[in-house]
Amino acid sequence: MEISSSPWNDGGYSPYERNRVAVSPFSSALEGEERIETSRSLGDHCFEPLPYVTNYLSIFALFGKEIFGDKGNVSSRNEYLLKKYYSLKKPFVLRHNGHALKNPDMPLQRNDILQTNFMVDKFLNRTVRSVNFNNFKIISDMQSKSGRGTKSGTNQNQSADAIQNICLPSIPSALPYFQYYRKLLTVNTKEWDILKLHSLWVPKLRKDFKDFSLYGDKNSLKPIDSHYDEDNTMKKNLFFERSPSRQTLDGKGCASKGYDISSGNMIIPSLFSEDKLPALTYHCSVELNGNIYIFGGLMPCYSYEEDAPMLNDFFVDGIKNLPPPLLPQVINNPSMVNNPHLYVASIPSCRFSKPKMGGYIPPPLLCVQGSKLTDRHIFFYGGFEIRTETRGDENGKYHLKKRLYVNNTGYILDIMSFKFTKIDIIVQPSKYNAYPTMSSRFGHLQISIDNPNRRASVHSSSMNEIHKMGSASMKQGSSITSGRLEKAAVLSSLPHNTVHTVIIFGGYRQTGDDRYEAMNDLWKIEIPVIRRGKKGYCKFSETANAILLTPSEKDKSDWPEERAFSAFSVHGTSLMDRSSLDMRLLNNLKNHFVLKPSYISQDRVVSPKPVFPMMVHGTHQDLFNSGSAAQESPKAGASASSASAASFDPDMDDNLENYIVNPGRKSSSIPMTAIGRQRLILSQEKPVGKTVVLHGGSNGLNVLDDMWLMDLECETWTPIETFAKADSSEDGDEKLDSVNVGLVGHRMESIGRICVCIGGMVQEDVDQFYSENDDEPPRKRKVDTLPLGGNFLNTIDLSTQCWEEHKITLSKKEDDEDRQDSENEDTNSNIVVGVGGTSLQCDKSIILIGGLISRRSNVKEIYLHGTITKSIFPSVNPSA
């Protein structure tokens, strides 16, 4: 039985007809269309498709045409589809029957959007071909017998003999999946789409790349002797192993022989999905409830490197003066198309899906930022859209004109219905600026603030007065005059149960054609909630209020300079406390614990209600002196309390009002030291503060290297000096040198007090990427020299403010190379540079999705990272 579900029916074109490759979708000229006489009048930038360094491969594709049959010339098909894709992007004058559009920002018509999305689906539809289930069953039987170590029988038919004579790969780790998939074949053949959901995608590595290594070793290059074997090198690899004769990973080689669970690792998980994960770059990823929601970005029009189309017929007038880390050779590449879809990845279950979106769907955006509003909603803001106009000439050439349009609209995604809601940002006027404006931006900082006051909690009178003062001053439109920020702007001007707050800082704005300017303005966006429902449903207002937060004149020096594409993460303020442990514990007891008034009054409570009735220690009785405590006189108890108070720090007796739970109730209060074994209750007077760590970024081609802390409670900035451990001196004392690590386009994740900076460019990389001479050879550094921040992983300990060195290298095996002069080689030549990807924390790991990778020895040779990488960092600092 053979079921055919071929997707090649696209208007009569067949990829097997080689003489149809040069056919142009512009063959029938539209009325009023202008032809181009010279082939290089609009652009002369020719591009090449980007290769893959990691990618996902269907497990059925390992057997090639034995299961799927001949796939044909996919490269020619993709070239035709790419020309058809750009033929839909005609100039606006031609799209509307000759009526010129005065507004270039007018969005595309719905019909154009549907046609464009249809063509993108054609690019992604790669593995749905004719499946020969008879051959699949035979191969499955052969894999099963090979896994048990038995030989195939001699009573097979001719088809089985023909397949057996072919050298098929033996994958023991895939045997359970083959057995599982055979059971799925018992379903009704009319429901073929069900089987697509159970397709398994396994990671694939590039041939000339061997392994990843979490920590680089300067002594990794050593002479070969008789005692040197492959096992010695594999003990240092903490990621995965691959057989030298194969391109795919085997289940037995996922961990090296010398693997230590406390040293951390990095793996590429396989995925169950109907669709292949595209190699996205400059996209947005948000983690919510254990799932990762991926939106926007660019993706290649080919799923595999061998399917890449020829780009000789495309000439691009691209976007100029792009700031780092936006690479012109990627943004302007005609093989990189906009991603119009939303993807959902579940890391614990290794599931990947492409849901159908609804509502006010935003355009394909690059460098858009997303943040969590509620457990059900995600807020997207900023980014930019790339719009392309296409013209054809008499020679069948395609001249593309790409332009950048910055987005200034917010969108809220409901993850249960996958519907988008459009939010317009309205700036609140003040007495200093009656008509303020908020510039459209990309590459900005965006953080959602979880306001704990939305829940019922105990507030002190001072906090209530601050709320009243803040609301009154906001109504008067007063500006920021006291402190570094205006106190009224710290608190929300709307009720806490009807508003969600988002903080936005910096980014690039567009000041003209191909001109961009960095900013350092700080905004607070308040998104009102009109109605709430079951299961976390919220109906948001169509408009959101934006409040500008500016520093005072005397504190402008304590404010970060203009920047964009900086890294940031959120930490608790307690991480920056330098006091000793005992003092922190005492201060915590003093500030957050009070005595319940009923238990320190003159009349003892006869039968108190237990906190935990099922536990012995849950009662309020003195279990240590139960017999004598009941007969103890109040006077003795009072004297004991006073004696205990006198024996401790007398400074704690000064502020007695801090221990009063309810000012309206008559009750006595005593210092914290006199509590003894009485019951303590936690005071919810003050919410836990949060601190935003901001590092690096760029202002044009200048890479910044400073680090700042922002207190979200007070909304104040504080510069932080960073250090690096220097070589030990002769007396054995360790020295610290004050250093600044400059990075742009990197990501930051927090693990306790450790900040992990992932990827990014240093100033040296920016100088090479954005040099005017593209043919300039890469600069050669001195041996064993690496710029600060040149590693793929850079970590800093916030408690010591010290940078630590970690590396991810791509090691290339060279069997026939003499290593006698290895000391003269650059040991850092295989360290990688990564930009354009996203990182987030999910499933107790750091997840890396997509992006671009290149070797530091040749940064202009860019590769696509088309997989999801899961990183588990060491539980113990190896340098400690």
Swiss-Prot record:
Its main location: cytoplasm. Residues 624-649 are annotated as: Disordered. It comes from the Eukaryota. The modification Phosphoserine is found at S24. The keyword Cytoplasm applies. It is found in: Cytoplasm; Mitochondrion. One of its GO terms (molecular function) is cAMP-dependent protein kinase inhibitor activity. Residues 638-647 have a biased composition (Low complexity). Keywords: Cytoplasm, Kelch repeat, Mitochondrion, Phosphoprotein, Repeat, Transducer. One of its GO terms (cellular component) is mitochondrion. GO terms for biological process: ascospore formation; glucose mediated signaling pathway; invasive growth in response to glucose limitation; negative regulation of Ras protein signal transduction; pseudohyphal growth. Kelch repeats lie at residues 291-339, 377-425, 501-552, 691-738. Changing A674T: In strain: Sigma 1278B. PANTHER family: GUANINE NUCLEOTIDE-BINDING PROTEIN SUBUNIT BETA 1-RELATED, KELCH REPEAT DOMAIN. G proteins are composed of 3 units, alpha, beta and gamma. GPB1 interacts with the alpha subunit GPA2. Beta subunit of a guanine nucleotide-binding protein (G protein). G proteins are involved as modulators or transducers in various transmembrane signaling systems. The beta and gamma chains are required for the GTPase activity, for replacement of GDP by GTP, and for G protein-effector interaction. Involved in the determination of the cAMP level according to nutritional conditions, most probably as a regulator of cAMP phosphodiesterase. Required for the control of pseudohyphal and haploid invasive growth. This is Guanine nucleotide-binding protein subunit beta 2. The lineage of its organism: Eukaryota, Fungi, Dikarya, Ascomycota, Saccharomycotina. The gene is GPB2.
